[in-house]
């Protein structure tokens, strides 16, 4: 609990009961008018920096249902990555990228006094705007647009008239990942490397893309769009705090000139297109772990979101799409939390899943009542996904090499002069780190990391990054550092999968696996006669494209062009293929794939001798 000095700014608190009013969240049937009284909360012994516009910690007192409450707030220092940037496009299509100053921002997390749970997500940019929980009920607060007045409206979420009474749902109908056995996390015995992975802090560097329809929905007002996104991510960050996953906004792109993909109301088409665009375009411009498309279009039916399951850190699939379906940012943030949960391997809740709320985050049908909580099933599935897949990208702390501002203790980033950083006094769960000083506690050798366990360096020789395949090489802790050594892989061209393939960049690419990835289980590679189509260069049958022209395959290269697959059911077409007008390489045989005895497909889609290919 914060030790604070209270400095009272005397503002009267006059509750007023209203019947109906139109606010930003919509038409509200019952509300109170309050005048929050600010109690400036200074950390004991700390001095507020004169150049800092927004304080690190604040308290406000006002009445709810005629009874006084105190709202404790602390700045969410982990909201933005240090290298946060924004991109939009001029009317003539020029890319405009900026690095706005976000260190002294106005977004806070907090709680109501005498309630230990962090359930408040508040913007203090112009008055208090956001939501909090009190005695299990969700309340919203926002300033009233009255000149020269400190008046705010406080109201229960249930008193907001529903924009659409129809049920809403997620588009995921089947999982792409499922644990081999329904083992409970508590029954699982971890290996040393799994234990090290689970003990390490998890960071998701999030990129959000706003499509052109949403840009026009907000009448091209960049400030309004930024505010909307910041409020959503502040709530998203709050929701994932309970899972010990820190979400930092690293990038915002606004398609102000036009969409970079064909955003359709068909969710699976849009999701696949967005994933392909992320892999070929966005990842080359901005390093991040996960991207979410926020769109103003209405998806088909009652679907408002869609995401790949168990796909975190996969270039083409660590994505989700979310419809901006409500005036209340809390509901949109809950939907984004749901789709991000799918990316983290969490499936929809079954009937037996429970949480301490009327609705849980991963319910298949999304409730009109917002939820801050994951069910017991969700927590177990996340745990199982992390220990079985160990997605590596979320172990990387936000870059410190790009930091140009002074070190900030409490933002989860270990910067110059710090030995550890576990967040604020409220958030810190690290027994090795002093949250007030960002220094290790006496006797601690380390704070966190895959090679740190119980504040001590892990024994030298402990596996910290197991081999992901026979084309990978395991790495071991040194016993003197928290870091796992640089990732190394087997030499390209080494035979793998019982000589069915050759190693390429740490993988063993073979055609049958690529067919299954494109078409699902029950598929295999088509006969050679199908691949001969690639000699024509017609339609989608080619080896590569240059200057918008199809380049046909030479006879010896046909198995390096379009990939043809067939289903085991003999009644289906024998030469099935996939393509995308937005990603010319989609559906082609992967580089490094075996195309004959002792031969592999090179980057120019030629079938060459494996001994000279690399």
Swiss-Prot record:
Keywords: Calcium, Cell adhesion impairing toxin, Disulfide bond, Fibrinogenolytic toxin, Glycoprotein, Hemostasis impairing toxin, Hydrolase, Metal-binding, Metalloprotease, Protease, Pyrrolidone carboxylic acid, Secreted, Signal, Toxin, Zinc, Zymogen. Expressed by the venom gland (at protein level). Expressed by the venom gland. The active site is at residue 339. One of its GO terms (cellular component) is extraorganismal space. Residues 202-398 form the Peptidase M12B domain. A motif (Metal-binding) lies at residues 338-349. Residues 21-192 form a propeptide. A motif (Cys-switch) lies at residues 167-173. It is an enzyme of class 3 (hydrolase). One of its GO terms (molecular function) is metallopeptidase activity. Belongs to the venom metalloproteinase (M12B) family. P-III subfamily. P-IIIa sub-subfamily. PANTHER family: ADAM A DISINTEGRIN AND METALLOPROTEASE DOMAIN (PTHR11905), DISINTEGRIN AND METALLOPROTEINASE DOMAIN-CONTAINING PROTEIN 28 (PTHR11905:SF32). This is Zinc metalloproteinase-disintegrin-like protein F1. It comes from Vipera ammodytes ammodytes (Western sand viper). The lineage of its organism: Eukaryota, Metazoa, Chordata, Craniata, Vertebrata.
């Amino acid at each position: 609990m914060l030790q604070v000095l209270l400095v009272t700014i005397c503002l009267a608190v006059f509750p007023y009961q209203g019947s109906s009013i139109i606010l930003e969240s919509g038409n509200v049937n019952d509300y109170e008018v309050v005048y929050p009284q600010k109690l400036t909360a200074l950390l004991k012994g700390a001095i507020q920096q004169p150049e800092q516009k927004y304080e690190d910690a604040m308290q406000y007192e006002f009445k709810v249902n005629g009874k006084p409450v105190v709202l404790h707030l602390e700045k969410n220092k982990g909201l933005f990555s240090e290298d946060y940037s924004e991109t939009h496009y001029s009317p003539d299509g020029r890319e405009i990228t900026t690095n706005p100053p976000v260190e002294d921002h106005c977004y806070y997390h907090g709680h109501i006094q005498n309630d230990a749970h962090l359930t408040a997500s508040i913007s203090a940019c112009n008055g208090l705007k956001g939501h909090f929980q009190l005695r299990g009920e969700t309340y919203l607060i926002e300033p009233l647009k009255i000149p020269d007045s400190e008046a705010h409206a406080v109201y229960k979420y249930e008193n907001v008239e529903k924009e659409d009474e129809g049920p809403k749902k997620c588009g995921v109908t089947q999982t792409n990942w499922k644990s081999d056995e329904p083992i409970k996390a508590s029954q699982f015995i971890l290996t040393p490397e799994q234990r090290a992975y689970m003990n390490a802090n998890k960071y998701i560097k999030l990129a959000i893309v706003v499509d052109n329809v949403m840009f026009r929905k907000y009448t091209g007002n960049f400030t309004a769009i930024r505010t909307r996104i910041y409020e959503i991510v502040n709530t998203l960050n709050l929701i994932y705090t309970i899972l010990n996953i820190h979400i930092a906004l690293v990038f915002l792109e606004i398609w102000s000139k036009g969409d970079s993909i064909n955003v359709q109301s068909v969710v699976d088409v849009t999701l696949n297109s967005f994933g392909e665009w992320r892999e070929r375009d966005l990842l080359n411009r901005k390093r991040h772990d996960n991207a979410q498309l926020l769109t103003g279009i209405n998806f088909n039916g009652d679907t408002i979101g869609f995401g790949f399951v168990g796909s975190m850190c996969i270039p083409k699939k660590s994505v989700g799409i979310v419809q901006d379906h409500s005036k209340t940012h809390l509901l949109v943030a809950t939907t984004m939390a749901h789709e991000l949960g799918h990316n983290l391997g969490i499936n929809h809740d079954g009937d037996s899943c429970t949480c301490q709320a009327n609705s849980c985050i991963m319910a298949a049908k999304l409730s009109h009542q917002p939820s801050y909580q994951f069910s017991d099933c969700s927590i177990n599935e996340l745990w199982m996904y992390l220990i079985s897949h160990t997605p590596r990208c979320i172990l990387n702390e936000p870059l410190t090499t790009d930091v140009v501002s002074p070190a900030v203790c409490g933002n989860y980033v270990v910067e110059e002069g710090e030995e550890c950083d576990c967040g604020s006094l409220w958030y810190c769960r690290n027994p090795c780190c002093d949250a007030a000083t960002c220094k290790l506690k006496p006797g601690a050798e380390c704070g966190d990391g895959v090679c740190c366990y119980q504040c001590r360096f892990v024994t030298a020789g402990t596996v910290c990054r197991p081999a992901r395949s026979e084309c990978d090489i395991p790495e071991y802790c040194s016993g003197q550092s928290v870091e796992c050594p640089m990732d190394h892989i087997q030499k390209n061209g080494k035979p793998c999968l019982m000589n069915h393939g050759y190693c390429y960049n740490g993988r063993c690419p073979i055609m049958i696996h690529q067919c299954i990835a494109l078409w699902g289980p029950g598929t295999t590679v088509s006969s050679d006669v199908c691949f001969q189509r690639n000699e024509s260069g017609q339609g989608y049958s080619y080896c590569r494209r240059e200057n918008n022209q199809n380049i046909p395959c030479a006879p010896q290269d046909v198995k390096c062009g379009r990939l043809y697959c067939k289903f085991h059911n003999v009644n289906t077409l024998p030469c099935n293929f996939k393509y995308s007008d937005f990603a010319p390489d989609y559906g082609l045989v992967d580089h490094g794939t075996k195309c004959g005895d002792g031969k592999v497909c090179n980057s120019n889609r030629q079938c060459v001798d494996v001994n000279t290919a690399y």
